[in-house]
Amino acid sequence: ISSYLRAFNSFLTWCRENGYSGLTVPNYKPKETVKETYSDSELSLLLKRPSASCSFVEYRSWVIVQFLLNSGCRASTIRNIQNRDIDLESRQVTFRHTKTGKIQVIPLCSTLSQNLRQYMRIRGGEASDYLFCTEHGEQLTENALRLSIARYNRSHGVQSTSLHKFRHTFARKYLIDCGGNAFTLQKLLGHSTLEMTKHYCAIFN
C-alpha cells in the first residue's frame, strides 16, 4: 500500500507543477497487528507424546507440530520437505521450497532430531519421498495438512487450529524465551527484508 501511495503522491506533485492543486494524500502507516500465539498450557497439551498404540496420522501430526514449533517454517514449506532434506548427523534440515525461492538450511534441536529419527524409521520410503506423507505414502495436500492438524489440536483440547500460529509462536519464544535477535530471526523465518522481521520484534519485545 505504501508503494502505491508514494507513486500516487508523485503523480499529485506532477499535477501541482502543471497547475492542478488542492489534492493531497496522507502518508500511510500500517498499524501493528497482534500476532496470536499458542499459550504454554496449549503447547503442553499439543506436545504430549502419543501412546505407542496411536495411529500413524496422530504420530505424524505430533511430529509436525514439533517441527513447526522448532523451525518456524511455513505450511507450504513443511509439506514439500523430502526425506533427503533431513540430515540427522549434522542435525539440520534443508528447505528447498520457500516463499522467497531461496534455499534455507535450519538447525534441528536434539529432541526433534531424535523424534524425527524414530518417525523416519516408521515412515520409511525413498530419499526423494516426501517426509510428511499420507498413510499411502503420498504428499500431503495443503488442505489435508490443515485438516489433520485441526483434528489433532481439537482432540488434544486445543480449539485454535491455525498452522501459521505455530510460526508466530516460534518467533515469540525465540525472541522472549531465548533472547534472540532480529537478524538471526530473519534468517530462520526466511524473511526477504529485515523490516518484516522487525514487525515481530515490535510486537513481542
Task: Give the location of each predicted region.
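Conserved catalytic core of the tyrosine transesterase superfamily
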Residues: 1-205
